A protein has these predicted regions:
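Hydrophobic "anchor" residues
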Residues: 78, 124, 194-195
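Glycine-rich phosphate-binding loop and adjoining helix at the ATP-binding site
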Residues: 81-83, 87-166, 171, 259-269
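Glycine/GP-enriched mid-protein hinge/lid loop-to-helix segment characteristic of carbohydrate kinases
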Residues: 149-240
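ATP-binding/phosphotransfer module of carbohydrate and carboxylate kinases, centering on a glycine-rich
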Residues: 1-34, 40-43, 47-83, 89-100, ...
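Short glycine-rich anion-binding loops that position phosphate/pyrophosphate groups of nucleotides
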Residues: 116-118, 182-183, 253-254
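Short, ordered coil/turn segments that flank beta-strands lining enzyme active or ligand-binding pockets
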Residues: 74-75, 120, 190-191
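Short glycine-aspartate micro-motif
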Residues: 57-61, 110-112, 174-178, 185
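Short clusters of small/polar residues that mark proteolytic maturation junctions
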Residues: 7, 83, 129, 199-200
Length: 308
């Protein structure tokens, strides 16, 4: 929040110019008056701040048996949220959800959707679960459906971006691993930038021979007795290919009490200086939402500035 004179000083603009700009923004609803500020002897100046409800962002998470959404304002406060269960996910179900929210919230600026599938530039290329979406360019489809920028990507990429933004902005590189109903997925940030590879296959650990061997060829969760070795071997692979500063393992019941064992196994597979810091995180949902919000907000602001 700031007064007209404070804004003028900060922007280096004349007081009349700032006054006209503020009047226009207040008329549009982007700025709101917050009363008078403190006085140093003269008349108290009116204070203005951004209206958090002027810009809304839709975050969509496509889960194994439901689609969950969270509509957030500029301050990341939840305006509306909910879940839609499904047996077989169809494009029509996603269309109906997005159209409904866009119709009811005309100040929706952008949307981001995460899905547990291999997604490359908006195209669902590999999925064992959402067969009706395979091969579709969801980004192009949704941008024709509603006149707002919308991106669709792999859930682990959004999760990793959120993890980086929330906790580890100073780390040079970061790798995340999450074990869900369809197995283990990974994500990678190098020098502050998400790295997905030439065609989006980076961190698709399910294609690794060690994963298939220790998972007994299953598409679901690995056997409990192989959990520690599987995680340690994955960390070993990342260490010799990327050499990250930090590995973040997201909490799962099968991981409980195994972190020390994973570290011991890593010490037997790698020299000490190659072992990254290994952290267990309980913040899956917070990090996932943070990643979705960060991307959606960035797209919305780019449109406002004429960049998209």
């Amino acid at each position: 929040s700031a007064s007209r004179s404070q804004i003028a000083r900060e922007l280096g603009l004349s007081f009349p110019t700032v006054g006209r700009l503020i009047d226009e923004l207040c008329s549009d609803g982007e700025l709101t008056e917050q009363g008078a500020g403190s006085s140093t002897g003269g008349r108290c100046a009116c204070i203005y701040e951004l209206n958090p409800l002027f810009s809304l962002y839709l975050l969509v998470q496509v889960e194994s048996d439901r689609v969950c959404w969270n509509l957030k304002d500029l301050r990341e406060n939840t305006v509306e949220q909910g879940c839609l269960p499904f047996e077989i996910l169809s494009l029509e179900q996603l269309d109906a959800l997005i159209l409904d929210i866009h119709h009811r919230y005309p100040r929706l600026k952008a949307a981001a959707a995460g899905i547990a599938a291999l997604v490359n530039h908006g195209v669902v290329e590999e999925t064992n679960q959402y067969i009706g979406l395979k091969g579709l360019n969801l980004e192009e489809h949704f941008r024709r459906l509603v006149p707002i920028p919308m991106t669709v990507g792999n859930d682990m990429n959004f999760l990793t971006m959120g993890c980086w933004a929330q906790k580890h902005p100073d780390a040079g590189s970061l790798v995340t691993l999450f074990m869900g109903g369809n197995g283990i997925g990974g994500g990678m940030v190098i020098n502050g930038r998400l790295w997905t590879g030439a065609s989006g296959y980076c961190s698709e650990v399910g294609f690794l021979p060690v994963y298939e061997r220790l998972n007994k060829g299953s598409l679901g969760l690995p056997p409990a007795e192989h959990i520690s070795e599987l995680y340690a071997r994955l960390i070993q692979i990342y260490a010799v290919t990327v050499n990250p500063h930090m590995m973040v393992l997201y909490r799962h019941p099968l991981l409980e009490g195994r972190l020390d064992e994973i570290r011991r196994l890593c010490a037997s597979y790698l020299p000490s200086k190659a072992i990254p810091s290994i952290e267990l995180s309980y913040d899956y949902q917070q990090d996932y939402e943070k990643g979705l919000f960060t991307v959606a907000k960035s797209m919305g602001q780019a449109v406002s500035e004429g960049g998209l």
